[in-house]
UniProtKB/Swiss-Prot annotation:
This is ABC transporter B family member 15. GO terms for cellular component: membrane. The gene is ABCB15. Glycans are attached at N542, N605, N622, N646, N769, N1015. The lineage of its organism: Eukaryota, Viridiplantae, Streptophyta, Embryophyta, Tracheophyta. InterPro entries: AAA+_ATPase, ABC1_TM_dom, ABC1_TM_sf, ABC_transporter-like_ATP-bd, ABC_transporter-like_CS, P-loop_NTPase.
């Protein structure tokens, strides 16, 4: 058993060293050179103090043991003072190297680490992201706060450690040279100083990992809510999110307090230094009495041992950060070193010289890695001939999209093989394989860059002409050309500034520009309106010519021209043939599906005679390009005069108030009081110790042995007393400040998230407020503020206490010398303060750069399937490199200032010592002070200088802390233009649901020059269903955004029940409105939790959940899953098919029992059979409710009480289905129906 424990211990040591190495794994040749020079600088800086002590011993011996009236007295003093000035010059050089080199290499290595980490994450196979449900928040944390931890260690904490270690070594060398007997006696005290530090470091590794794991859970809650803020707002889920976030934070609070206690015990243990002085004073007196040692030499050796010990203790206090960085670095290296099973970077594998595109699935067996109990394919076979179009149809969740995922090698099958041109795809080079395919997914993933850049994701080296041609082929060129910035228009995070149809057309252009051999279309036209769909369908059919095409569609009218149609059911192909062949089998699966869809269109086919519709359709085609459905906002967004002021203030946060920060800590006032008292007492210990030390030195120069023994006993006991006090006070101080800091951090995070979730949707649409950037601020800023209030506040109180007491004592003992020594203190303070100001101005840009990196990382991970499909990893890495260019330049400047600041402050300290001794010698010679007064005053005020220097060492933390506090209050103080909790708002228990738009003007804040509505009016009757139809980008979804009050109109009024929507208490109003969006947003929880999210009450019965699921036609598929309602949905519902997600979203809305139901393409993702049943369910749910239905598929809205037709942001027609058709070919609705009938 003992041997096993020994082996385990050995393994832990190896792991520890391995994790420490991980901090430096990102260094290149230049970094090693910088670290080498920085090492010389840090070691040189450390050796400066022992050298100063060596010279000081000579000065003290001159002062204490010489006759003050001789001519040689001042000569000796002057000579040794000049020697101190030489040391100061050398100190300047080494300190500059230390400051410059470490700051520079810290930024270089962390920038490279971010790049390697993101590259490694994007290299992982899709299965990795399925299994790591918090991967998005993990990546944000690693790219922002984790890289910040490593940069802090490399730039500041590591050089501090090296400097402290070299001070320790240098001190012992000087001690042995001057008085080896005393040095040997002091040697055992090292053990007493080292053990607490090592124990603390070991405990900290465990605690810091646990804290990180605890916060990751909270960060994931926040990231989900912010990235899906429209869903959170629509379902009034803010309080649920805050409650879940708060619960997740509680664990990290307890661990943080535990960490503070461990730190208090460790630093308190350094009080052993005082006890050591007690022993060394006694033993030193014996050296003086019996071995002829001089007092100055005894002091220098004892001081060297004490300073060496204190330095080692100070170095060990940096272990906290060092081990934390090692823990972070190890976790990051695990990801970087992870080689995925399906490796897109692996150059091995065949590249076919000429690819025909014949695809074959042979006896494939497959389950998703995250749902091993649910079999998707078992002995699945499919053959796609070269150059042919094969359409896959079947129920939602039958495995159609899995075919595309397996063909692209997102996953590998468990058994069987997949062949292209007779070659198994696992033998082909992964990147080459994917380059032969063009993918258009059901939910198009766009990146927060320009339209042009998004299309170029398909082909890196394409020309502008290629981009335009691809856009024309996907029917996107016209609407892009109408935008003010054309192809340079920013699409926003996840493409939020584009309508669904516009996003889909950009995604199709991205696939077409690739000129792929194999075209994969997964519901490629599901988001398009009728007119766009027809043209894009033609474009896709043209693109399919000569290419192998696999087409998945619920709308069977889009696939009737396919060469082969295969019906998938329960993971098997149950029918195969052409449309005509399959229709011959009346009882077949395919003919049944077609029959279901034809029933929906019977009325249309009877009513419409397809005739002279070319002109109207042409008009529609032109009109659909004019308006752009922007859903976003940017830094110069405008929602009215008050908002202009509001947004400009966003960018200018007021100077942070420390008083306000303390006010937030008011509930912990007892801990604050105890902590401050403890810090004040610990501050007083330093001057008391210095006074005892100065007095003790003067004792060594006494001639009476009895007097030496008596006074030595008194001072030795006082040192022991100080040691005990120091231990107890430190424990109290660090525990209380950790308690304060942790609860403040929790409170700040809760209040920030709570405040953020009151901001208008336009704020989230701005580039700088992406979910990644906000989560990064939640993680990082609160941590920095905690450090400011905890560790830094304690240090400030200590410093004030020590300085006040020391200055008073110095002035009482020897006022002339004290005044000179106090007068030069500001010089050192100014150096540190200047360094702080320079670093503060530059740290802002560093933080901004990390936000940019976080935003990019979050977006990349969210769209990892698209990146994988298009092998766009390199393009993302170039975007990251571009985002870091500006901060790289700033870092170089920052390094120079860091070097100069440290060099000046450290070298001036030695200069002041030279001045103190020279001037003190003059005062002694002139008879103004005694040697005892000089030693006491010098010790007291020099120790104060050290305290100020220690306080100065936190200038970097203060700079970062000040920015973080400013960032926190900028969020907390921001005025919300659409306040969901307006106390004056009208709260209503129920609404009838009459909606009216009166002379509404509206443009999305990001593009105020593109008018969506101008004098727009519409009345939606209570309890009736109103369908909104029209071309893509005509303003249909904008109506829903205004009813939900995501935005306010620029002019005019939106009324509900005859009352201006702005007069309502917004959250109470939203309780009566339910939204089902085109792209359903689910949260990472169980199906049950996602449905309950729609509940207004906190207590929802199981029967209500099942009833809602049945109404949405979801109950059957949910109960067929192994875990049933407890099935985990995955991040954003990735574990479920599009149709399954949509049905859960509908169930969530049904559970709300709303007065107003908003359906934005609610059935677009469903297959025909599900659509019919859900459509019936929705129609039942719509009875007696005000329903606003947006649909491209006109067959789904013909039973609505009223149909409103929009074009170019205007209401051009209104009536029932039959009354609008009766207008004939001149009517726009007639034309839209005719287009769908033609394509059907």
């Amino acid at each position: 058993m003992g041997k096993e424990e020994e082996k385990e211990s050995g393994r832990n040591k190896m792991n520890c060293f391995g994790s420490v190495r991980s901090i430096f794994m990102h260094a290149d040749g230049v970094d090693w050179l910088l670290m080498g020079l920085g090492l010389i600088g840090a070691v040189g800086d450390g050796f400066t103090t022992p050298l100063v002590l060596l010279i000081t011993s000579k000065l003290m011996n001159n002062i204490g043991g010489s006759s003050f009236n001789t001519d040689t007295f001042m000569q000796s003093i002057s000579k040794n003072s000049v020697a101190l000035l030489y040391v100061a010059c050398g100190s300047w050089v080494v300190c500059f190297l230390e400051g410059y080199c470490w700051t520079r290499t810290g930024e270089r290595q962390t920038a490279r680490m971010r790049e390697k980490y993101l590259r490694a994450v994007l290299r992982q196979d899709v299965g990795y992201f399925d299994l790591h449900v918090t991967s998005t928040s993990d990546v944000i944390t690693s790219v922002s706060s984790d890289s910040f931890v490593i940069q802090d260690v490399l730039s500041e904490k590591l050089p501090n450690f090296l400097m402290s270690a070299s001070t320790f070594v240098g001190s012992y060398i000087v001690g042995f040279i001057l008085l080896w007997r005393l040095a040997i006696v002091g040697l055992p005290f090292i053990v007493l100083l080292v053990i607490p530090g090592l124990m603390y470091g070991r405990a900290l590794i465990s605690i810091s990992r646990k804290i990180r794991e605890e916060y990751n859970e909270a960060g994931f809650v926040a990231e989900q809510a912010i990235s899906s803020v429209r869903t959170v707002y629509a379902f009034s889920g803010e309080r649920k999110t805050i409650s879940k976030f708060s619960t997740a934070l509680q664990g990290s609070v307890k661990l943080g307090i535990k960490q503070g206690l461990a730190k208090g015990i460790t630093i308190g243990s350094n009080g052993i230094t005082f006890a050591m002085w007690g022993f060394m004073s006694w033993y030193g007196s014996r050296m003086v009495m019996y071995h002829g040692a001089q007092g100055g030499t005894v002091f220098a050796v004892a001081a060297a041992i004490a300073i060496g010990g204190v330095s080692l203790g100070g170095g060990l206090s940096n272990l906290k950060y060092f081990f934390e960085a090692a823990s972070v670095g190890e976790r990051i290296m695990e990801v970087i070193n992870r080689v995925p099973k399906i490796d897109s970077d692996n150059p091995d594998g065949h590249k076919l010289e000429k690819i025909r595109g014949e695809v074959e699935f042979k006896n494939v067996k497959f389950v998703y890695p995250s749902r091993l109990e649910t079999s998707i394919f078992d002995d699945f076979c499919l053959r796609v001939p070269s150059g042919k179009t094969v359409a896959l149809v079947g129920g939602s969740g039958s495995g159609k999209s899995t075919v595309i995922s397996l063909l692209q090698r997102f996953y590998d099958p468990l058994a069987g093989e997949i062949l292209i041109d007779g070659v198994s795809i696992d033998k082909l080079q992964v990147k080459w394989l994917r380059s032969q395919m063009g993918l258009v997914s059901q939910e198009p993933a766009l990146f927060a860059t320009t339209i042009k850049e998004n299309i170029l994701f398909g082909k890196e080296d394409a020309s502008m002409d290629d981009v335009v041609e691809a856009a024309k082929a996907s029917n996107a060129h016209n609407f892009i050309s109408q935008l003010p910035n054309g192809y340079e228009t920013q699409v926003g995070e996840r493409g939020v500034q584009m309508s669904g149809g516009q996003k889909q057309r950009i995604a199709i252009a991205r696939a077409i520009i690739k000129s792929p051999t194999i075209l994969l279309l997964d519901e490629a036209t599901s988001a398009l309106d009728s007119e766009s769909e027809r043209v894009v369908q033609e474009a896709l059919e043209n693109a399919s010519i000569g290419r192998t095409t696999i087409l998945i569609a619920h709308r069977l009218s889009t696939i009737r021209n396919a060469d082969v149609i295969s019906v998938v059911k329960n993971g098997h192909i149950v029918e195969t043939g052409s449309h005509d062949e399959l229709m011959e089998n009346i009882d077949g699966q395919y003919s049944t599906l077609v029959h279901l869809q034809q029933i929906e269109k019977q009325d249309i086919n009877v009513s419409v005679k397809i005739g002279p519709i070319s002109d109207p359709s042409k008009d529609i085609r032109n009109s659909s390009r004019v308006s752009t459905l922007s859903r976003s906002s940017s830094a110069n967004s405008v929602t009215g005069p008050s908002t202009i002021k509001n947004l400009s203030e966003d960018n200018k946060p007021q100077l942070p108030s420390f008083k306000r920060l303390l006010a937030m800590n008011l509930p912990e006032w007892k801990q604050a009081l105890y902590g401050c008292i403890s810090a004040t007492l610990f501050g007083a210990i330093q001057p008391a110790y210095a006074y005892s030390l100065g007095s003790m030195v003067s004792v060594y120069f006494l001639t009476s042995h009895d007097e030496i023994k008596e006074k030595t006993r008194i001072y030795a006991l006082s040192f022991v007393g100080l040691a005990v006090l120091s231990f107890l006070i430190n424990i109290s101080q660090h525990y209380n400040f950790a308690y304060m800091g942790e609860y403040l951090t929790k409170r700040i995070r809760e209040r920030m998230l709570s405040k953020v979730l009151t901001f208008e949707v336009g704020w989230f649409d701005r580039d700088e407020n992406s979910s990644g950037a906000i989560c990064s601020r939640l993680a990082k800023d609160a941590n920095v503020v905690r450090s400011l209030v905890g560790d830094r506040m304690a240090l400030v109180v200590q410093t004030v206490s020590a300085v006040t007491i020391a200055f008073t004592m110095g002035l009482v003992i020897a006022w002339r010398l004290a005044l000179v020594m106090i007068a030069v203190q500001p010089v050192i303070i100014v150096c540190f303060y200047t360094r702080r100001v320079l670093l503060k101005s530059m740290s802002k840009k560093a933080i901004k750069a990390q936000d940019e990196s976080s935003k990019l990382a979050a977006e990349a991970v969210s769209n990892v399937r698209t990146i994988t499909a298009f092998s766009s990893q390199e393009r993302i890495m170039k975007m990251l490199e571009k985002a870091q260019e500006s901060p790289r330049r700033e870092s170089i400047r920052q390094s120079w200032f860091a070097g100069f600041g440290l060099a000046m402050s450290q070298s001036l300290t030695s200069c002041t010592w030279a001045l103190d001794f020279w001037y003190g010698g003059r005062l002694i010679q002139d008879g103004y002070i005694t040697a005892k007064a000089l030693f006491e005053t010098f010790m007291i005020l020099v120790s104060t200088g050290r305290v100020i220097a220690d306080a100065g060492s936190m200038t970097t933390d203060l700079a970062k802390g000040s920015d973080a506090v400013g960032s926190v209050f900028a969020v907390l103080d921001r005025y919300t233009s659409i306040d969901p909790e307006d106390p004056d708002g009208y709260e209503t228990e129920r609404i009838t649901g009459q909606v009216e738009f009166l002379d509404v003007d509206f443009s999305y804040p990001t593009r105020p020059d593109v008018i969506i509505f101008k004098n727009f009016s519409i009345k939606i009757e209570e309890g009736k269903s109103t369908a909104i139809v029209g071309p893509s980008g005509s303003g249909k979804s904008t109506i829903i955004g205004l009813i939900e009050r995501f935005y306010d109109p620029l002019k005019g009024i939106v009324k509900i029940d005859g009352r201006d929507i702005r007069s309502y208490h917004l959250r109470s109003l939203r309780r009566h409105i339910a939204l089902v969006s085109q792209e359903p947003t689910l949260f990472a929880g169980t199906i049950r939790e996602n449905i309950i999210y729609g509940g207004v009450s906190d207590k929802i019965d199981e029967a209500e959940i099942i009833e809602a699921a049945k109404a949405a036609n979801a109950h059957d598929f949910i109960t067929s899953l192994t875990e049933g309602y407890d099935t985990y949905c995955g991040d954003r519902g990735v574990q479920l098919s599009g149709g399954q997600k949509q049905r859960i979203a509908i169930a969530r809305a049904v559970l709300k029992n709303p007065s107003v139901l908003l359906l934005d393409e609610a059935t677009s993702a469903l297959d025909s059979q599900s659509e019919r049943v859900v459509q019936d369910a929705l129609e039942r749910v719509m009875v007696g409710r005000t329903s606003v239905v947006i649909a491209h598929r006109l067959s789904t809205i013909q039973n609505c009480d009223a149909i409103a037709v929009l074009d170019k942001g205007k209401l051009v027609e209104r009536g029932t289905h039959s009354s609008l058709l009766s207008k004939g070919p001149t009517g726009i609705y007639f034309s839209l129906v005719s287009l769908q009938t033609t394509s059907g």
